[in-house]
């Protein structure tokens, strides 16, 4: 009975839009929803502050974030992994 049960955490995929803060990135998460009345597919977006260790993600990277305990007033997410690095032209 000493087994630890791992909680199922919510995970989202988004693009890093800002990495100017220390140990924090701003992630833009977009989702497509159908309008209830007119049926048109529209894009909804939300920005989340996510905790990142040692500059693991930079602006433009595609990252997966997962929910965690509140780290600060606005941070309750952390970067789980970097899915795709930003391309430099």
UniProtKB/Swiss-Prot annotation:
InterPro entries: NA-bd_OB-fold (IPR012340), Ribosomal_uS17 (IPR000266), Ribosomal_uS17_bact/chlr (IPR019984), Ribosomal_uS17_CS (IPR019979)
Biological function: One of the primary rRNA binding proteins, it binds specifically to the 5'-end of 16S ribosomal RNA.
Protein family membership: Belongs to the universal ribosomal protein uS17 family.
One annotated GO molecular function: rRNA binding
Alphabetic keyword roster: Ribonucleoprotein, Ribosomal protein, RNA-binding, rRNA-binding
One Gene Ontology biological process: translation
Protein's UniProt name: Small ribosomal subunit protein uS17
Top-level taxonomic group: Bacteria
NCBIfam families in alphabetical order: PRK05610.1 (NF004123), uS17_bact (TIGR03635)
Keyword Repeat: no
Quaternary structure, from the entry: Part of the 30S ribosomal subunit.
Entries under CDD domains matching the protein: Ribosomal_uS17 (cd00364)
SUPFAM superfamilies, per the entry: Nucleic acid-binding proteins
Pfam families: Ribosomal_S17
GO CC annotations on file: cytosolic small ribosomal subunit
